[in-house]
Amino acid sequence: VPGFRHEEKFTLNDPAVQKSPLADVRELILKPVETDADAARRVREALLGMGREGDFGRLGEAAEWLARWQRRFPPRIEKPTLAIFAGSHGIVDAGVSLSSNSDTRAHIEALKGGRAPLSAIAAQAGATVRVFELALDRPTPSIAKEAAMTERECAATIAYGFEAVEDQPDLLAIAVSGAGVGTAAAAVACALYGGSPDYWVRPSAQTPASLSGKRSELVSAALKLHRGHLSDPLEALRCLGGRELAACVGAIIAARHQGIPVVLDGFATTISAGVVHAISPQAVSHCLASHITQRPAHEAALERLSLAPLLQLQFQTGGGLGSATAIGVLKTACAPFIAKPVEG
């Protein structure tokens, strides 16, 4: 992020610093960022020259959004990155997930080795896959017993998320991997938006009802334990979330300050954006919802952020499939503005 380095902005190891480490994060979220309204206007004018208003539908809207946030015309995607943030959760021991922390490790190893289906989809889109492992061998504590992170750990993890933009991509797609992350995200959603745990842990049709009950009980216990901290979105993230959610928050913040559009994936990344949105709605205007999963809570979260999904492909969950697929669609949105005319 222009103007500071991680070690300068987050003086996490300086005992002389009295304010909360998360105060710096809040300041970055609230700090205004300039966009390029002229580039967006040129997209609109070019579209009108290609046909009637609205002919290009969501593609036209996406092109305008890209130009505004890339701060250039024509918009183009030449260096996209797909960032996968992987974490582990102590709540898995309570039986709230169909997968385990060892499954997360296996998935990450497959991604790093280029063997996962997601690797092929990202390659087809021309995206670089970057995997960020967040202490996979040290699960966060069960949020029903203690906070997921200390203030310093949460702030440091948010700062670590800044590294997703260190290669200066012109589009950043984000996703998470972690058994239990959906339940943690549901707990954060309860704190941000209210409603019952049952509402936010609502599963897809393939999830056993018994699992939903365990998730709801755990979220209820966590909300009761941390009830004195949940009026602050960053505190809700710290107490109820996980490292991958915090790193996504950091990636979203850093991308905005560097003029990099962000493509969200599933429910968990949407809730990470929700944390930022709860502090400043304008601070997520550079984010686009790639798709909508079959998890009902995902649709509810998108509604809270006033985000319409670009795609509806009936994916069961996130995991990067939606955000990776959307990269190709967004490249298509740019094509009319950068195509060279064919000479007859």
Regions found by a protein language model. Name each.
Residues 2-5:
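Extreme N-terminal basic, low-complexity initiation segments
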Residues 8-344:
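N-terminal loops that bind phosphate or other acidic moieties
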